[in-house]
Amino acid sequence: MIYILFVLFVVVIITLSLWVLSLARKQKKSVLLFEENYDLKAITIADIDRMEDGSGFEMYLYRLLIELGYSGVYKTLGSRDFGADVVFTDREGVRNVIQAKRYSTEYPVGISAVQEVFSCMRYYKAKKAIVITSSHFTESCETLAGINFVKLIDRTDLIHVIEAFRDGDMIEARDIIEAEPRMILESWSEANSNTLHEVRKDYKAEKYVKKVISK
């Protein structure tokens, strides 16, 4: 009986020790991301993938833009950002709003990111909007961004920015960030036509409304 109690005691001690060690490692990792003196050039895409949430990614981008020499760089308050995580002024003197999405590669960014960052432009008096992600974008997200001239920076672009910064090539990093967005433009005939785009109707809703009205 005493032997069994001793074994149980040892198991409990080992379990608690492992839990405390795991917690300490997590706390250390979080502190690393928010300490003002951590080496920004040491951060790689792998470090971004290990971040526990989006706030670490936002802080990284905030510091990166400052290091790249941009002016008017601000990190917004998380709870009331109206769709923008970081704001900065580019080399042309144009204010940009950024929405940062730290997603794992198996989860692409959807259209809500474009909707949110585009809708907050007027609030921040910005002329350009950017969505930056550690993942990729859905096809519908790319389409909506192209129509509204929202710049999309995906994982591949982000890696190029990080590598350029780590190599000390600030101009290349800024050129990637400030490159014109992929635009989806209408032809001249479409732009001057009175024909509206086809709307995908909800026929169930239409049928229901007709039924209600007919009563």
Predicted regions mapped to residue ranges:
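Mixed-charge (Asp/Glu-Lys/Arg
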Residues: 1-82, 87-215
